[in-house]
């Protein structure tokens, strides 16, 4: 394919137009009075959302240079979402502010490498100051506040807080769509282990890249499955029952894996293969846990059992199994209650007896998976459009609360970034490095400025007053009042704020040091002339 090139100022200005188009679409959503964005969906109803990363992913521009600029900011949103699970709009606003301010200085003759050094220096100091100002999340009420601020809904914050209380901070919390109007919380018995599907062709939902199996059979074995013939008799019985199957084995490979994938793609049956969790003796113990939870029989040479002789009665069952690239969650296994209780008691005894800290930790993990549970937040809404929007907000809020538990919380509403302004301004630097520090200083005020503007106020006035306010005191755009943000529960997770700043600075620095851009020239489709009719035909 033929390529076209742009250099220096032409290249950067073209990319800046793309940055601005994407950022302007995203930043209208920030703050309590932020607006929604409507996304056109080709085969379904339009999606109404205020989720930054969802909006960013949808944007594709016609001009290849502008599109590259937009993709750079998409990367900021994606990375922030990947690390912290929220804060994508803040990251986008920060990136745009740094790129715009940086480009003014590059155009005026500043050295981009010096600017980059200044940006890196300033961000390092800002992150250290954020951690110094961070407070630990210590109770259920604070967790609820984080969730409520992220989702702009107190009810959602309460549900997440209750879910984390019931299954623990590291417990498994899933979000499902409900058929009703109300959002509800359920805690279901379940087990999760860190093994995902062996082939992406096994997924049932290609948008989320997840395999969801309803009422599946579950085969549990410590054997390697290489030959499809070994499991064919068993699969024939499963096909007759018209139910999916989860295969948990040491490994599924060779023609066994090929045939499972081919039959899945043809629609003959739905099967998902995952590797057994753990290693060595611990793997056998974890397979036994899974078998007891689901009512399965472990197919193993230790018991003289062979895959060819396995019957459907040896399989376990569960109400639902969800398999992602990295994890498998078994919900509501049909194992015998007495057997599960006996296994739990056995694990508790082993925890008391063991002298190894490592073994104790692993036993406690197994106990939590067996006796703990999976919290399910069932999202209800009046329409499909509202349901999707609400589900996205709950996912963001859940990620925010987990991030808050991990690294603590800081004052929300962009206040935390302005609170570190003083520390960053004290950095001793000169020349282009000092200019780089000033770029970050201006960007630190951008989220507050945008939140104020979305609330119909003059951003510059709010920023100047905030710079002179006591640490922690900020502007509540929902009520137009100046309050102590931490005291009234307007908080952001430190991890979210930190990640947004770091990823925005990283992409801005790369943008400013770009000197040439190479893009593909779109191929033009020449219209084919209409073919004339054959002689004698009408």
Curated annotation (Swiss-Prot):
Major localization listed first in the record, in broad terms: cytoplasm
EC number: 5.6.1.7
Reaction catalysed by this enzyme: ATP + H2O + a folded polypeptide = ADP + phosphate + an unfolded polypeptide
Domain of life: Bacteria
Enzyme class at the top of the EC tree: isomerase
Entry annotated with the keyword Secreted: no
CC annotations in GO: cytoplasm
Keywords, ordered alphabetically: ATP-binding, Chaperone, Cytoplasm, Isomerase, Nucleotide-binding
Any one biological process term the GO annotation gives: protein refolding
Function: Together with its co-chaperonin GroES, plays an essential role in assisting protein folding. The GroEL-GroES system forms a nano-cage that allows encapsulation of the non-native substrate proteins and provides a physical environment optimized to promote and accelerate protein folding.
Alphabetical list of PANTHER family matching this protein: 60 KDA HEAT SHOCK PROTEIN, MITOCHONDRIAL
HAMAP family attached to this UniProt entry: CH60
Protein family per UniProt: Belongs to the chaperonin (HSP60) family.
Quaternary structure, from the entry: Forms a cylinder of 14 subunits composed of two heptameric rings stacked back-to-back. Interacts with the co-chaperonin GroES.
Name of the protein: Chaperonin GroEL
Gene (UniProt): groEL
